[in-house]
Amino acid sequence: MSTPSIVIASARTAVGSFNGAFANTPAHELGATVISAVLERAGVAAGEVNEVILGQVLPAGEGQNPARQAAMKAGVPQEATAWGMNQLCGSGLRAVALGMQQIATGDASIIVAGGMESMSMAPHCAHLAGGVKMGDFKMIDTMIKDGLTDAFYGYHMGTTAENVAKQWQLSRDEQDAFAVASQNKAEAAQKDGRFKDEIVPFIVKGRKGDITVDADEYIRHGATLDSMAKLRPAFDKEGTVTAGNASGLNDGAAAALLMSEAEASRRGIQPLGRIVSWATVGVDPKVMGTGPIPASRKALERAGWKIGDLDLVEANEAFAAQACAVNKDLGWDPSIVNVNGGAIAIGHPIGASGARILNTLLFEMKRRGARKGLATLCIGGGMGVAMCIESL
């Protein structure tokens, strides 16, 4: 499936820890920052953007259409539209696919697409329209309810990871080893400055002065198997999934500027890469973490590629269990997967992660001179999404 859509520029904020650096920063402010960054990196004026599409899973309490808020805060004129979409963890990558489709149909020539999320600012709420005459009432944690709980079986995403671990016979040791490797790779990448080009600094204003956030704060330096082994199972007393071999609760944003090949050629712009294909596929919600398996196969088929053609892969690490299952089933070379660590180390701001891994993939492909790459994520509710990228 060939399209005329190419990625001209990409950027992300650092990923913040839960109640960390971005604890009081609304998602649309993070989104505005990455929109501004990709416009600057591409040399495109805000007034030239046709539309902004941003994934977000937890918009409750942020006001009408946070994507529109982000766009206008970034200087995109009111004549250009903006909207948000929600495909849970796949939102950021699906937003890019939607932007690609807008360009492919001729409805737009320049799109900014990506994702943003503040898990820290997701509110607790209660339905009080009917009134509470007396006694206590229940508050709902919207982050847990809307972002992390399976709507069909009523259990946490961590339980779906336990299901995958059992089905794929993945031991605690295997999951912990995967998680430690992710942390160690991310630590090495951070110390080596490999994330600096993709991260745009964000200034957090405070009473004691401004703080510039320009480095991922969730990465655990010095992670070891011994420290990982001390953690208790988080979702099943007899289980294998822990806080250490699962991704975190995080805040962040990422975006890409998409343009038609004709428009890029007219402007004389050298793109980061071309979107060759994409796919999204449904699976059993009980094992939602396996979604990248059929989604990746379908995206590769549409691209006319084979797994062996891939130079780099960014496969989101919602849980070590599902990441190990994906790696085993697809059989790709593990040395090309998440070479700078994944979400277990960097973090998983759910609505932004799809754009974050695409961003990381594009910059690492450029750094290595890699030709073909694939980005993929599992999605709550039983889905997967994948995208094939080719350098130009």
Swiss-Prot record:
Pfam families: Thiolase_C, Thiolase_N. Its EC number is 2.3.1.9. GO terms for molecular function: acetyl-CoA C-acetyltransferase activity. Keywords: Acyltransferase, Cytoplasm, PHB biosynthesis, Transferase. The active site is at residues 89, 348, 378. SUPFAM superfamilies: Thiolase-like (SSF53901). PROSITE patterns: THIOLASE_1, THIOLASE_2, THIOLASE_3. It comes from the Bacteria. GO terms for biological process: poly-hydroxybutyrate biosynthetic process. One of its GO terms (cellular component) is cytoplasm. Its main location: cytoplasm. It catalyses: 2 acetyl-CoA = acetoacetyl-CoA + CoA. Pathway: Biopolymer metabolism; poly-(R)-3-hydroxybutanoate biosynthesis; Metabolic intermediate biosynthesis; (R)-mevalonate biosynthesis; (R)-mevalonate from acetyl-CoA: step 1/3. It is found in: Cytoplasm. Homotetramer. Belongs to the thiolase-like superfamily. Thiolase family. This is Acetyl-CoA acetyltransferase. It comes from Shinella zoogloeoides (Crabtreella saccharophila).
